[in-house]
């Protein structure tokens, strides 16, 4: 049976991950730890014999720079890359820039958990005159006003990620090309929910660690057979737990 592999990588720790702030579409860069995580992901992939024909990422530099570091370790810096806003992190609306623990102290752990992980729950909206509104950013100049979010739930994130998967990424895989995607916690959760047919309750508890390669294997009909992280299982579990705890009051 022919098996096709897909590799997903959540960007390495960003400066705002380090500061425990809601990031969303804010274009913050990797921390020093995040750069190390991205390089380590590339080394792991090289050790496991992975190489790629095409890469996808978002238009946010924490994902782009993660991909750069991964491909550099693979000696594949030349690889063609498509960047799309449809792989961006979920837009956190008016929460962007706020400290997660302080927000939990103000609104309660459960409210913040719902904002972070609830399926159809949207954080408070931005206004269009807010400097954080993506309509002020030249990289989104070609998007219609309808496409520019004031806030997003995971459900709304799925509405942009999955058509991009079905229309753009999957056809490339079906043509025989080996693909890697470097993206974000919630854009990858959107894809994982779809691939694994997860319920809304199941996705609430899913936390994807930073900078760890997640491998999906597909059968000849491009149905997922299995998935697994590369690396030390205990370290990966600890990193996922740390992601879950970011939204709790101190």
UniProtKB/Swiss-Prot annotation:
Residues bound to substrate: 10-17, 23-24, 62, 89-92, 100, 116-117, 185-186
Superkingdom assignment: Bacteria
Catalytic residues (positions): 11, 89
Gene Ontology biological process terms in this record: gluconeogenesis; glycolytic process
Gene3D superfamilies, alphabetized: Phosphoglycerate mutase-like
Catalytic activity: (2R)-2-phosphoglycerate = (2R)-3-phosphoglycerate
Residues in coiled coil: none
Pathway assigned to this chain's UniProt record: Carbohydrate degradation; glycolysis; pyruvate from D-glyceraldehyde 3-phosphate: step 3/5
Function text: Catalyzes the interconversion of 2-phosphoglycerate and 3-phosphoglycerate.
PANTHER family: PHOSPHOGLYCERATE MUTASE
Family indicated by similarity: Belongs to the phosphoglycerate mutase family. BPG-dependent PGAM subfamily.
Protein name: 2,3-bisphosphoglycerate-dependent phosphoglycerate mutase
